[in-house]
């Protein structure tokens, strides 16, 4: 039988691949954003500066603090990579999401999985890099491939999980391969690319589970993510091959406006594997990048089915402006 032997969560923010003295390049975009989401409401930049004036965010977004937290985040990534290498699983289940890299508005499945033999990880052509907004091209190296490459999918386990989820009343999109786009074949979303570029030291056969965390109207709720994770965990436990299975949640924590108070509630649920707490988190907080926490919630429910316990939690809020914009980084193992 298959065994769930290791789980981890990691942020995949562009800031993790951007030198701290370049974080300001995205602040101009923050200032132009008419809908900075914070605690269930939308703000403009100056409104957040006023609202959060007592939090010393000008200091927290200063270059020395940015550099310190960037360095701490890099150490956490190294720890995750070394831990995964030491565990050396046969398969890695990656719970991620898409931000219009694969799915477009005319077809956005709530839950999708690949069951083919491989998945593409594509490089970004120089002409596309040149046309990217300030700060994005710098960070692209953290998620995109240096050159086009294909990685193995555990097709048999993926098919088993899809069939098992269907019996558990989950209606999901099953793909032999990712859909083609206007430029031809598409590659994996950056939520997955980060794991291959920054965490894996060697290719590991994988299972890709994609959640629509970002886009209305069909995002799975937190409680549905708990149920999904439990169902995936049961499917793995009932699989009749002797496999050592690891699980990863990619994304989060709160961004693009950091909310440390909410993150601490989330982290408490993740650390203690309190499924009731995680399932009851308010949906209005899961907007924009913060919605990627649902990838972690699903992962936590899977590892809970495997009987694992929390062994590491690094929480590093990386502010880039006095409005509280940036990304709260999280790195966790079970």
Q: What is each stretch, according to the model?
A:
Residues 13, 82, 96-98, 107:
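N-terminal low-complexity, Ser/Thr- and acidic-residue-enriched intrinsically disordered segments
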Residues 1-87, 112-230, 235-238, 258-334:
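Flexible, D/E/H-enriched segments
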Residues 90, 94-103, 177-183:
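Short, glycine/charge-rich beta-strand/loop segments that flank catalytic centers
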Residues 90-96, 209, 243-251:
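Beta-strand elements within well-structured catalytic alpha/beta cores of enzymes
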Residues 104-114:
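Glycine-rich loop at the start of a catalytic domain that most often binds anionic cofactors/ligands
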Residues 243-245, 256, 289:
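Basic polyanion-binding and macromolecular-assembly surfaces
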Residues 15-18, 100-105, 254-258:
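Short catalytic/ligand-binding loop motif for oxyanion handling, primarily in non-cytosolic enzymes
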């Amino acid at each position: 039988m298959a065994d769930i032997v290791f789980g981890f969560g990691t942020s995949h923010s562009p800031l993790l691949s951007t030198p701290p003295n370049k974080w300001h390049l995205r602040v101009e975009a923050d200032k132009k954003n008419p809908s900075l989401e914070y605690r269930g409401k939308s703000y403009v930049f100056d409104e957040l500066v006023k609202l959060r004036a007592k939090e010393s965010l000008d200091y927290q977004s200063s270059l020395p603090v940015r550099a310190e937290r960037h360095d701490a985040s890099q150490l956490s990534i190294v720890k995750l990579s070394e831990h995964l290498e030491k565990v050396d699983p046969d398969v890695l289940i990656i719970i991620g999401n898409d931000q219009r890299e694969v799915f477009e508005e005319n077809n956005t499945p709530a839950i999708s999985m690949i069951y083919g033999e491989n998945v593409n990880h594509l490089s970004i052509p120089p002409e596309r890099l040149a046309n990217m907004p300030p700060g994005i091209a710098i960070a692209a190296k953290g998620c995109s491939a240096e050159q086009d490459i294909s990685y193995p999918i555990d097709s048999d386990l993926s098919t088993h999980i899809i069939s098992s989820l269907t019996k558990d009343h989950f209606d999901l999109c099953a793909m032999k391969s990712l859909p083609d786009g206007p430029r031809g074949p598409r590659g994996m979303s950056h939520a997955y690319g980060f794991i291959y570029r920054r965490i894996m030291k060697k290719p590991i056969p994988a299972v890709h589970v994609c959640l629509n965390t970002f886009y209305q109207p069909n995002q799975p709720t937190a409680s549905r993510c708990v149920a999904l994770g439990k169902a995936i965990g049961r499917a793995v436990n009932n699989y009749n091959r002797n496999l050592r299975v690891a699980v990863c949640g990619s994304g989060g924590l709160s961004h693009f406006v950091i909310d440390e108070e909410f993150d601490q509630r989330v982290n408490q649920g993740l650390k203690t594997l309190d499924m009731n707490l995680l399932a009851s988190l308010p949906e209005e907080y899961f907007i924009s990048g913060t919605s990627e926490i649902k990838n972690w919630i699903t992962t936590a429910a899977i590892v809970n089915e495997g009987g694992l316990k929390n062994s590491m939690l690094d929480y590093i809020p990386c502010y880039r402006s006095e409005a509280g914009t940036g990304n709260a980084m999280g790195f966790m193992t079970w």
